[in-house]
Amino acid sequence: MSFNFPTTDELNEQGFDKQFLSALTHVKKHMDEDSNTPIHFGAFIYFWERYLFAHADRLSENYKGGSWTLENGFWCLDSNDQFDVHTGYGAKYTVNAMEFSIIVNLFALSHMAITTYQQKGNEFINMLSVNFSDYIKLLLDRSLEKLNTEAIYMVTD
C-alpha cells in the first residue's frame, strides 16, 4: 500500500521539529548499513521492536510471527493474512496486515511513551515515541479512503 506522505513543509506545519525529522530520516534508512545510526537512536529502535512483537502477540490470536520491515516511519508486517483484533469493550474487527501493523505500532509507541515519561535519561526515547505516534496518526488522516480507520481507532482507543 502506498501512503500519501507529507512533505517536510507539511510536517513542519504540523509542529514536528528538526530533531524528529532527522530521526524519521534515520528510520527510513534503518535497514541501510551505511546509515550511521546514533547509539541513542539505536536504543529507541531496539525498544520499539521489543514492544512491537509483544503487542502483536497480545493483540491477535491469528498473529503467528512474521517478517517486519522498518520503512516509511513505522514497522510493517509483510503478510497477506487477516488478523482478528478486539477492543477493550468486546467489539471484534478483522484487519489486513497493514492495518494490524499500524495498530501494533501505536500500542508499542504508546507503551514506550508511558514507560519513559519523566524518566531521567529517557527523554529522547519519550520524545521519539510521541512524535512517531503522531506521525503515524498523520499518515492515517491522509489515508482514510485506503484503510479501515474505524477499526484502527476503535482498537487503539
Name each model-derived stretch.
Residues 82-157:
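Polybasic, proline/glycine-rich intrinsically disordered low-complexity segments
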Residues 12, 16, 37-42, 59, ...:
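A general marker of short, structured functional hotspots
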Residues 16, 26-32, 57, 61, ...:
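Generic surface-pattern signal
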